[in-house]
């Protein structure tokens, strides 16, 4: 088991990481709603997908320990 997998079996660690990612995603979505040019919007979309993927991976690896 990798160190990351070991950490993700700690419920508090999973909650903390997930909360940080969700807060970043919320901020990003607020920025998207404020608007910007097409290039910036594309960057925000990629960042949003990356954050959503990270959350999904953590839940998968951690066995969804919330």
Swiss-Prot record:
Keywords: Cytoplasm, Plasmid, Virulence
Entry superkingdom: Bacteria
Disruption phenotype: Deletion mutant has no detectable level of YopN secretion, YscF expression or YscEFG assembly, but it expresses normal levels of another Ysc component, YscJ/SctJ. Deletion mutant fails to secrete YopE at 37 degrees Celsius in the presence or absence of calcium.
A UniProt-annotated Pfam family: T3SS_needle_E
InterPro entries: T3SS_PscE/YscE
Keyword Cytoplasm: yes
Gene Ontology CC annotations of this record: cytoplasm
Location of this chain's protein in the cell: Cytoplasm
Description of how the protein assembles with itself and partners: Component of the heterodimeric YscE-YscG chaperone. The YscE-YscG chaperone forms a stable ternary complex with YscF/SctF. YscE interacts with YscG, but makes very little direct contact with YscF. Homodimer in solution.
Function, in words: Chaperone of the type III secretion system (T3SS), also called injectisome, which is used to inject bacterial effector proteins into eukaryotic host cells. Along with YscG, prevents premature polymerization of the YscF/SctF needle protein within the cytoplasm. Is also required for stable expression of cytosolic YscF and for YscF secretion. Likely plays a role in targeting YscF present in the cytosolic YscEFG complex to the T3SS apparatus. Required for Yop secretion.
NCBIfam families per the UniProt record, alphabetical: type_III_yscE
Stated family: Belongs to the YscE family.
Name of the featured protein: Type 3 secretion system chaperone YscE
Organism: Yersinia pestis
Gene: yscE
């Amino acid at each position: 088991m990798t160190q990351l997998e070991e950490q993700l079996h700690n419920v508090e660690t999973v909650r903390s990481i997930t909360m940080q990612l969700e807060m970043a995603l919320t901020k990003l979505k607020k920025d998207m709603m404020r608007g910007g040019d097409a290039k910036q919007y594309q960057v925000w979309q990629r960042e949003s997908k990356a954050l959503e993927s990270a959350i999904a991976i953590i839940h998968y690896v951690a066995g969804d320990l919330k």
